C-alpha cells in the first residue's frame, strides 16, 4: 500500500509518518486482511457448535444441524443487532445512574437543565411540578426499572416515547418490546445452538430490538445528558488538529458517555492541577474530543469549560493521532476504542486509562467510574496524565497547523429555536422546492468502503449539490468537519436553491447534530415535521444514509431507522446476501410493514441517485 487512502490530507500524512516510525495503524493493517472470506461476506458461515465451522454453498445447502442459509444469516444478524442494542442501552444505563446520583445528592453531578427534566418527566407520565431532585430520582428509577424488565413484561418507556402514528404501526405489527435487557438476553438465547430456526421470527425480533436501540438507548442517552449538562446550543467554533498543541497535557477521550467524561473536563480547570501541570513544563491541561463522546460534548461546548478543545478525531483517526506523539493519555469508556491503541501507545509512551471495563484496552490502567466518586477519579486520571507528560519529554511530536470553522450544537431543540419556534419555516422551504428534501448522513467510518472517510465526503457533497439538506451525526462528522462542510462558506458547494437558503440564513448546507447518539435527534426533527403536517414519517421527503457503517451498533441504528419508516442507504452491503429471503425482507418486504427499508449501494454517486429518487417520489405523493 503506497499511500494511505483517506479523505483528509492530515490523516493521510499522520499514517505515512507513523509507518516511518514503525507504528502500525488500521490503515496499514487493512490490506493484510485480503483476500476476504466469501462466506463471511455473505453471512453464510456458522461457528456455534463443535461440528463447525459450517459454510453454505450450492453443493452443501445445509449445515450439519440442517440450518439453511436463511437461518444462519438471520441468526447472525439478530445476534449483531442484539449486541448493538446492548451497547446503546449500556450508555443510557450509566446516564440514568448519573441522574439518579444527582437527584439523591450523591457525588458531583447536578441537574443543569430543569426544563428538559420536566419535559421528560411529563412525557413519562410524572407530575412535572415536583421538586427537581425528587423528579430526577423518579425519572431515573423509572428508566432503569424499565430496562431490567423481563421480555414478557411490556416496556412502558418505548410507547411513551413513540410518535402516535408510529405507535399505531408497532401495535398493529405486535412488535412493542418487553424490557430492553430481557429482549437482548432472549435474542442471544434463541440464536444459540439448535434453538430458533425460524428466520422470520429472528427478523421480527430485530425490529423489537431496534425500538430499544432507538428509544431506550439513543434518545434516552441524549435527553438524560441534556438534563445533566445542558441541551445542544448552536455555536460557531474554530478548531482542528492545531488544537492538539505539543506544550499541553493532552488527554484524548474515546467512547460515547458524556456523563463519564464531564468530571474530567471540570477537574482539568482546578487550580492545583493546573499548577502541577505547569511545574511539569506544560502550558495547560486539555481534553481532546475523539469518537462519539467528543462530538456529543462539542454539541454542548457552550456549556463546557475551556479545558475541552472540541471534537478532533473519528474512530480511525485515533491511532494516527496518538502516533503523532501529541497525546499524553487516552481515557476510554466505550467504543470506538481500537485495540491497536495498545501497540501505538507502547511506541509513544502514551498512558492508557480505562474508566468503564466495557472498553478495557489491553495494557490500560483500570480506574472504574462510579457516579459517587467521579470527581475524585477524574483528578486521579489527570495526575497520571501529567506524570505521563513529564515522562514523555523529548518524545517526537508532529504538530499540524490545521483549523476549521464549524457550526456545532444543532439539535432538535436548538434547530427549532433557530427557525423561530417551529419547523414551519423548514417545511415551507421544502414545499417550495428550495430544499428538495433532507437526508440524515450518519454513523461510522470504515476502511472497506472506498477508504477512510472518502465515501462520506463524496456522497455528502453530491447530496448538497442536488439541493438536499444534510443532517449529520456520528463518526461521519470528522471528515465533514475537516473538509469544511460545517462552515457556512461551504454553501458555495451546494445547488443554487440550497445555496440561496444557506446564505440567507448564514448556515452551512450540512448541519452537525453531533454523535451517533444524535441519530435520535435527527429522527425527532422528522417527527416534528410529520406531526406538523399530520402525516407519518414514511410519507416525508426524507431518507437516511450510513455510507460507511462499521459495527453492530450501526446495524441496530439501521433497524431503528427502518422501524421508524426511513429508507436507509448502507455501504458496504451488510453480510446478508447469502440469504435471498433475508435480503428481500430488508430491501423490499419490510417496507410494506414499517414503511422503511435498506438500500445497499457502495457507489456514492449511485447512492445519491437512489436517495434523490426516494425524495422525489415522496414529494410527488405529497403533491409538492
Swiss-Prot record:
<comment type="subunit">
    <text>Homodimer.</text>
</comment>
<comment type="function">
    <text>CODH oxidizes carbon monoxide coupled, via CooF, to the reduction of a hydrogen cation by a hydrogenase (possibly CooH).</text>
</comment>
<dbReference type="InterPro" id="IPR016101">
    <property type="entry name" value="CO_DH_a-bundle"/>
</dbReference>
<feature type="binding site">
    <location>
        <position position="444"/>
    </location>
    <ligand>
        <name>[Ni-4Fe-5S] cluster</name>
    </ligand>
</feature>
<feature type="binding site">
    <location>
        <position position="516"/>
    </location>
    <ligand>
        <name>[Ni-4Fe-5S] cluster</name>
    </ligand>
</feature>
<dbReference type="InterPro" id="IPR016099">
    <property type="entry name" value="Prismane-like_a/b-sand"/>
</dbReference>
<dbReference type="InterPro" id="IPR011254">
    <property type="entry name" value="Prismane-like_sf"/>
</dbReference>
<keyword id="KW-0533">Nickel</keyword>
<feature type="binding site">
    <location>
        <position position="475"/>
    </location>
    <ligand>
        <name>[Ni-4Fe-5S] cluster</name>
    </ligand>
</feature>
<feature type="binding site">
    <location>
        <position position="65"/>
    </location>
    <ligand>
        <name>[4Fe-4S] cluster 2</name>
    </ligand>
</feature>
<feature type="binding site">
    <location>
        <position position="49"/>
    </location>
    <ligand>
        <name>[4Fe-4S] cluster 2</name>
    </ligand>
</feature>
<dbReference type="InterPro" id="IPR010047">
    <property type="entry name" value="CODH"/>
</dbReference>
<dbReference type="GO" id="GO:0004601">
    <property type="term" value="F:peroxidase activity"/>
</dbReference>
<protein>
    <recommendedName>
        <fullName>Carbon monoxide dehydrogenase</fullName>
        <ecNumber>1.2.7.4</ecNumber>
    </recommendedName>
</protein>
<keyword id="KW-0560">Oxidoreductase</keyword>
<dbReference type="GO" id="GO:0051539">
    <property type="term" value="F:4 iron, 4 sulfur cluster binding"/>
</dbReference>
<feature type="binding site">
    <location>
        <position position="256"/>
    </location>
    <ligand>
        <name>[Ni-4Fe-5S] cluster</name>
    </ligand>
</feature>
<keyword id="KW-0408">Iron</keyword>
<keyword id="KW-0411">Iron-sulfur</keyword>
<dbReference type="GO" id="GO:0016151">
    <property type="term" value="F:nickel cation binding"/>
</dbReference>
<feature type="binding site">
    <location>
        <position position="292"/>
    </location>
    <ligand>
        <name>[Ni-4Fe-5S] cluster</name>
    </ligand>
</feature>
<feature type="binding site">
    <location>
        <position position="37"/>
    </location>
    <ligand>
        <name>[4Fe-4S] cluster 1</name>
    </ligand>
</feature>
<dbReference type="GO" id="GO:0046210">
    <property type="term" value="P:nitric oxide catabolic process"/>
</dbReference>
<comment type="similarity">
    <text>Belongs to the Ni-containing carbon monoxide dehydrogenase family.</text>
</comment>
<dbReference type="GO" id="GO:0042542">
    <property type="term" value="P:response to hydrogen peroxide"/>
</dbReference>
<dbReference type="GO" id="GO:0006091">
    <property type="term" value="P:generation of precursor metabolites and energy"/>
</dbReference>
<dbReference type="InterPro" id="IPR004137">
    <property type="entry name" value="HCP/CODH"/>
</dbReference>
<feature type="binding site">
    <location>
        <position position="54"/>
    </location>
    <ligand>
        <name>[4Fe-4S] cluster 2</name>
    </ligand>
</feature>
<dbReference type="GO" id="GO:0050418">
    <property type="term" value="F:hydroxylamine reductase activity"/>
</dbReference>
<feature type="binding site">
    <location>
        <position position="46"/>
    </location>
    <ligand>
        <name>[4Fe-4S] cluster 2</name>
    </ligand>
</feature>
<keyword id="KW-0479">Metal-binding</keyword>
<keyword id="KW-0004">4Fe-4S</keyword>
<feature type="binding site">
    <location>
        <position position="336"/>
    </location>
    <ligand>
        <name>[Ni-4Fe-5S] cluster</name>
    </ligand>
</feature>
<dbReference type="Pfam" id="PF03063">
    <property type="entry name" value="Prismane"/>
</dbReference>
<dbReference type="GO" id="GO:0043885">
    <property type="term" value="F:anaerobic carbon-monoxide dehydrogenase activity"/>
</dbReference>
Amino acid at each position: 500500500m503506497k499511500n494511505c487512502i483517506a479523505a483528509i490530507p492530515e490523516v493521510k500524512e499522520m499514517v505515512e509518518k507513523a509507518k516511518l516510525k514503525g507504528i502500525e495503524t488500521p490503515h496499514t493493517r487493512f490490506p493484510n486482511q485480503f483476500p476476504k472470506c466469501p462466506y463471511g461476506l455473505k453471512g453464510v458461515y456458522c461457528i456455534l457448535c463443535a461440528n463447525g465451522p459450517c459454510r453454505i454453498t450450492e453443493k452443501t445447502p445445509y449445515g450439519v444441524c440442517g440450518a439453511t442459509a436463511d437461518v444462519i444469516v438471520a441468526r447472525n444478524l439478530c445476534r449483531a443487532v442484539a449486541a448493538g442494542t446492548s451497547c446503546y442501552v449500556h450508555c443510557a444505563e450509566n446516564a440514568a445512574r448519573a441522574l439518579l446520583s444527582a437527584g439523591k445528592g450523591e457525588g458531583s453531578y447536578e441537574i443543569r437543565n430543569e426544563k428538559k427534566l420536566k419535559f421528560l418527566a411529563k412525557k413519562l407520565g410524572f407530575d412535572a411540578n415536583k421538586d427537581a431532585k425528587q423528579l430526577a430520582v423518579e425519572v431515573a428509577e423509572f428508566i432503569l426499572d424499565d430496562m431490567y424488565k423481563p421480555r414478557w413484561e411490556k416496556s412502558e418507556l418505548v410507547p411513551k416515547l413513540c410518535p402516535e402514528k408510529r405507535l399505531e404501526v408497532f401495535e398493529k405489527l405486535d412488535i412493542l418490546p418487553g424490557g430492553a435487557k430481557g429482549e437482548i438476553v432472549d435474542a442471544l438465547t434463541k440464536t444459540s445452538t439448535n434453538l430458533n430456526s425460524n428466520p422470520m421470527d429472528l427478523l421480527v425480533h430485530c425490529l423489537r430490538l431496534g425500538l430499544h436501540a432507538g428509544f431506550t438507548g439513543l434518545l434516552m442517552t441524549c435527553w438524560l445528558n441534556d438534563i445533566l449538562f445542558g441541551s445542544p446550543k448552536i455555536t460557531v467554533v474554530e478548531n482542528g488538529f492545531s488544537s492538539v498543541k505539543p506544550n499541553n497535557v493532552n488527554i484524548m477521550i474515546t467512547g460515547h458517555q458524556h456523563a463519564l467524561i464531564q468530571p474530567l473536563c471540570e477537574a482539568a480547570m482546578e487550580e492545583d492541577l493546573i499548577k502541577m501541570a505547569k511545574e511539569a513544563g506544560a502550558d495547560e491541561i486539555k481534553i481532546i474530543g475523539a469518537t462519539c463522546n467528543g462530538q456529543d460534548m462539542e454539541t454542548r461546548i457552550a456549556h463546557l469549560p475551556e479545558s475541552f478543545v472540541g471534537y478532533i478525531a473519528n474512530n480511525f483517526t485515533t491511532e494516527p493521532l496518538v502516533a503523532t506523539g501529541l497525546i499524553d493519555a487516552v481515557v476510554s469508556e466505550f467504543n470506538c476504542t481500537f485495540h491497536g491503541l495498545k501497540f501505538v501507545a507502547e511506541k509513544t509512551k502514551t498512558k492508557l486509562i480505562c474508566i468503564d471495563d466495557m472498553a478495557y484496552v489491553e495494557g490500560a490502567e483500570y480506574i472504574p467510574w462510579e457516579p459517587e466518586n467521579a470527581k475524585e477519579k477524574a483528578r486521579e486520571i489527570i495526575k497520571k496524565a501529567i506524570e505521563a507528560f513529564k515522562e514523555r519529554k523529548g518524545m517526537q511530536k508532529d504538530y499540524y497547523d490545521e483549523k476549521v470553522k464549524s457550526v456545532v450544537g444543532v439539535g432538535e431543540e436548538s434547530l427549532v429555536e433557530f427557525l423561530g419556534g417551529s419547523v414551519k419555516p423548514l417545511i415551507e422551504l421544502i414545499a417550495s422546492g428550495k430544499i428538495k428534501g433532507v437526508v440524515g448522513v450518519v454513523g461510522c467510518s470504515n476502511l472497506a468502503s472506498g477508504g477512510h472517510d472518502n465515501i462520506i465526503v463524496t456522497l455528502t457533497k453530491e447530496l448538497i449539490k442536488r439541493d438536499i439538506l444534510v443532517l449529520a451525526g456520528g463518526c461521519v462528522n470528522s471528515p465533514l468537519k475537516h473538509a469544511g462542510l460545517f462552515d457556512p462558506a461551504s454553501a458555495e458547494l451546494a445547488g443554487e436553491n440550497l445555496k440561496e437558503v444557506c446564505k440567507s440564513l448564514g448556515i452551512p448546507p450540512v448541519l452537525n447534530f453531533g454523535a451517533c447518539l444524535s441519530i435520535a435527534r435527527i429522527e425527532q426533527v422528522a417527527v416534528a415535521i410529520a406531526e406538523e403536517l399530520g402525516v407519518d414519517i414514511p410519507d416525508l421527503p426524507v431518507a437516511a444514509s450510513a455510507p460507511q457503517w462499521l459495527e453492530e451498533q450501526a446495524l441496530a441504528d439501521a433497524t431503528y431507522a427502518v422501524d421508524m419508516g426511513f429508507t436507509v442507504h448502507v455501504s458496504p452491503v451488510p453480510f446478508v446476501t447469502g440469504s435471498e429471503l433475508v435480503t428481500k425482507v430488508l430491501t423490499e418486504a419490510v417496507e410494506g410493514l414499517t414503511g422503511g427499508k435498506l438500500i445497499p449501494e457502495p457507489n456514492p454517486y449511485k447512492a445519491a441517485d437512489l436517495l434523490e429518487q426516494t425524495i422525489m417520489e415522496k414529494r410527488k405523493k405529497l403533491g409538492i
